């Protein structure tokens, strides 16, 4: 039709595939946002009609929570032959892979080995920083920390006690990746599989991706010394 404008990209098509937390998609959205702000500053205000329609006057379902698209790695098949004790490395590898720094936990393990043992938090921090990531070991995290980090697109390494009853957790500790938080659960990528968070130990070697661990039973295993005592590693680009 004469005078018609050709549209090369439809936002409606792009939104179908957008996942907050994917670095390349977030970067592209930021670029588009900056272009729109520069060319049409008024269009980006919340009082605009398009935003009211989008938000349905603030009536979105509050239970719709973000789960980050973190690739899964199992510690059980590590080429090192020591996968049974490499939960920390396989968890760190998932986050490094999420940021596009490694191909998997075997590659990550070869890098981490330069800095120390898999159980050594300092070795993990050095390996992550070597890959160009910001990494900080923390011992005073809480549920709010996980909500903030995951809602802003950053998965968190969490260290917790996986043996014994949730009422009296024990053991040397286990590491997994917190990829989201909902009203009743902390959502994990657990490199060892599906934990029995009520009684301790593991139910299955399978099912470790996007597993919902009930806050009622998992938090006592993480917040052992109080509501602000969670161990974890905060990682960002």
Regions found by a protein language model. Give the residues of each.
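Active-site-adjacent structural segments surrounding the nucleophilic cysteine of cysteine proteases
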Residues: 3-117
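Extracytoplasmic/secreted proteins, especially bacterial periplasmic and envelope-associated proteins
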Residues: 13, 27, 31, 86, ...
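Short, surface-exposed loop and linker segments with low hydrophobicity and enrichment for Pro/Ser/Thr
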Residues: 1-5, 39, 142-156, 224-229
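Short, flexible beta-strand-to-coil junctions
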Residues: 34, 160-164, 236-237
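A structural signal for well-ordered alpha-helical scaffolds and beta->alpha junctions
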Residues: 89, 120-121, 211-212
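Active-site-adjacent substructure of cysteine-protease-like catalytic cores
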Residues: 138-197
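Noncatalytic regulatory segments and standalone regulatory/sensor domains
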Residues: 68, 181-237
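Catalytic cysteine-centered active-site loop
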Residues: 102-145
